[in-house]
Amino acid sequence: MIQKRTLWVAIPFVMMAAVMTGCSDDSDAPYTTDPVVLELTRSEKELVNQSNEFAFNLFRKIIPVPNSWSDPMPQNAIISPLSITYALGMLNNGAAGETQEQINKVLGFGNYGTDSINAFCVKMMRTAPQLDPQTKVMIANNIYLNKSYKLIPEFVQKAKTFYDATPETRDFADGKTENVINQWASDHTERMIQKVFKDGQFMPDAVSYLLNAIYFKGMWASPFEVQNTKDELFGTTTTMPMMHQTNTFGYTETTDCQVLQMPYGNGSFAMTIFLPKDYNPFQEIPTAEEWQQVNRAIRTTMVDVKLPRFETTTDTYLNYVMSEMGMPDAFDSEKANFSNFCYTPTYIGLMKQVAKIKLDEKGTEAAAVTVIDMNLTAIEPTPSQIVEFHANRPFLYVISEQQSGAVFFIGKYVGE
């Protein structure tokens, strides 16, 4: 039997920052301009919908809804499903057979070939940074290759063409590569994520590390005034700084929750917050179809908003979750088929993501790093009056691109 080697596919992070842009103008007034049109074909729109289905399914697996008060309660969490999509999309060019089919199915791309997925990824990577001159968006990919191994030329070409990732060959045993990868992560997240690996996670005998970074920096289209932030009760026992403003925002309601949509910059990106109408740790995660329904139902409404200022960091181990979602072969040293990736048989030994978010009066800053270790081998009408949206209890939030509806980040905040 051929022993398969470890391939670390590191998707180091996805970074989002919605803060004041680095310019000399001290004014808090947002600079706005009309959004660039993101033109998607019918099949590309379907790819977005399927990708969002993966996003919500993934978060549902990571943050399971408790069945009773005796079950573990949800914790603060944030993930970037889009980062995982890019990392696995790039790696899937090296997969074959059942392994490739399973990855495609989990990502929601089962009816599409890798060429369609590659074309969609490169289109989003090229277009997203152009949607709003006030908002900085970067999507970057990279590959570090152990000098002891060689990649399949066709995979290398696709990585360059569709993901702007050119393999860099290094001696993984030189004691420097881990720091090089960490520095790359730091450079592409404005230092939000400076360490990709926990102690002992970097493997000198790994075949390769594949990395993806998504960075977003902007500001609320309607910032909060710092002087209006007051300490108030969050939940039943915790006091937190609560930001406050009354303004027009996107708003709707479902039977169980209020939904607020707050735009960044010129409105190309927004945060959508799902707030249960009562304190409810059993809040369900929406499906992609429900996400579409909510976006169609949202109307501009005058809303009195209270939102906590918070920061959350999540380090999520993804091997078990992704295997449970339907791609077990990729993690199995005997079944994995990445014959189009490397001349040496490989499998995924570790897949993880580190994510971080900061939310304050100016906007939102977030980052996520995903690491995959491959081893060898019904909506109600919107009220017309001023609506109270006081997020003083656990809530779900989604950061998305508005024209396509593509989900960049999903998080849950339950308090400190």
Q: What are these regions, as identified by a protein language model?
A:
Residues T99-I103, P281-Q283, T314-T316, A367, ...:
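Extracytoplasmic/secreted cell-surface and envelope-processing proteins
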Residues I2, W8, T21-F172:
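Detector for small/aliphatic-rich hydrophobic stretches
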Residues R393-E416:
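C-terminal or internal capping secondary-structure element at the end of a domain, subdomain, or sheet
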Residues P276-R299:
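Internal alpha/beta scaffold segment
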Residues G200-Q201, S384-A391:
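Exposed beta-sheet edge/beta-hairpin loop segments within beta-rich domains
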Residues P74, T114-K277, I298-P381:
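Non-catalytic, conformational "gating/processing" segments within enzyme and secreted inhibitor domains
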